[in-house]
Amino acid sequence: MALAVIPYDRQAAVAYAHKWAFGRNPDFFDYEEVGGDCTNFASQCLYAGTGVMNYTPVYGWYYIDANRKAPAWTGVEYFYNFITRKEVNPGPFGVDAPLEAMEPGDFVQFRFDKDTFGHTPIIVSIGSPPTLENTLIAAHSYDADYRPLSTYFFRDIRFLHILGAYPQDTPREKPPKPPGSVEQGQPAQQQPRQPAG
């Protein structure tokens, strides 16, 4: 039985990108000093637009804490491989596509002077017709918002068009609880409730 597709909320992903482009969400570890934070930030944006993770060990796309995360959450090539996978399983999915197919909320990957791609920004604005000058991105490592693609010096570029996400369909897809966590819906006994916002 095929899983239904969850629509990708591009506006939510882009809003998240603008909110955290020059800051760090305290719910996620900052990998700036341990290889870079770009794909971690891209994954956070994508999660803001889909709300679905894939908790398959090693091959999934998930974040629990700094040490319990899938390689695809923080690794450029792993992110690409997960998003463009052919298997129908939980999590966001998409296709390698030309610049002309891009929309805000899609992703760009650059290859600089190495053999592999090494940077994953999110597209936050795109002109018509799209060009490297009017396609603007947000990123971490180095932090940017509304930065034109044309300001990067790269050897290769590829684009990821997000099509949606497959839902988590079984209880086994749920993550293990982090230490000290509280069951959803149960307030912590010793902590006052904080107002939303």
Question: What are the roles of these predicted feature ranges?
Answer:
Residues 134-136, 140-142, 149-197:
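Low-complexity, Gly/Ser/Thr/Pro-rich intrinsically disordered linker/tail segments
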Residues 48-54, 125-128, 165-167:
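Short regulatory "switch" loops immediately downstream of catalytic or recognition motifs
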Residues 34, 59, 90-93, 126, ...:
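Feature targets compositionally biased, intrinsically disordered low-complexity regions
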Residues 27-36, 56-66, 112-158:
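Glycine-rich catalytic cores of cysteine/serine-nucleophile enzymes that process amide/ester linkages
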Residues 1-73:
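N-terminal capping segments
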Residues 63-137:
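...with weaker cross-activation on analogous glycine-rich loops/strands in unrelated enzymes
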